[in-house]
Amino acid sequence: MTVFPFPPDFPGLSVPFSVVGFDWDSGAPDGELLVLPRGCGAPAFDGPVFTPDAAFDDDRVLRPADAAPEHGPVWIEAFCPHGTLRSRLTAAVAAFGSRLWLHLAPMSTLYTLPCPDGAGTPVSDAERAALLAAHPSCFCPEFVCQCAHWPDSDIIRVLLYDTDETLAMQLALAAACGVPQVFGPLTTANSAAVLTD
């Protein structure tokens, strides 16, 4: 598995930047990813480009400009709205093989149940701290993240969030499931293999 550790304060998708990847097993440098937002590149650019085009299961794609859409790399998020993260990764590897790119980034989202569309509300660090002061959390093995839940009138509120430990567990699970490429704001705290030089 090749891991591309974006800096924790990476500039998102507004300016181009380059990320050196490393081999998960050996820790040796293994490839370079140029992140080039839509509209930032020359027409003849043939490197990876993030696009919001839908692929399989409403996931975004990471597609070389010179590759046909049906052969382009497929970008999926680690968040799993249905089933388990393990089943999501296993199914994605089976469907896309070497084309699969997993985006691994911390989540902090509040949901209201029932939640038929799977959409939640992003929660800031301060908001999350206030919620956790009032409601204890536990580890959720299905989603490989932390979870707090509580009743609120006739609904249930659910807070799902990541820690360095859960991100490290997600990265290890991705390797175990055969995910070929991972990218995101990984640090030495959540990935012991991330190079520091």
Located regions from the model:
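Glycan-binding loop/region signatures in secreted carbohydrate-active enzymes
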Residues: 97-166
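A structural motif corresponding to the C-terminal end of an alpha-helix
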Residues: 91-100, 169-182
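Hydrophobic faces of well-ordered beta-strands that scaffold small-molecule active sites
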Residues: 17-22, 32-36, 49-52, 60-63, ...
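Boundary/entry segment of secreted carbohydrate-active catalytic domains
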Residues: 2-39
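Short, acidic/polar
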Residues: 25-28, 64-67, 162-173
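Extracytoplasmic/secreted cell-surface and envelope-processing proteins
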Residues: 41-44, 84, 110-113, 190-195
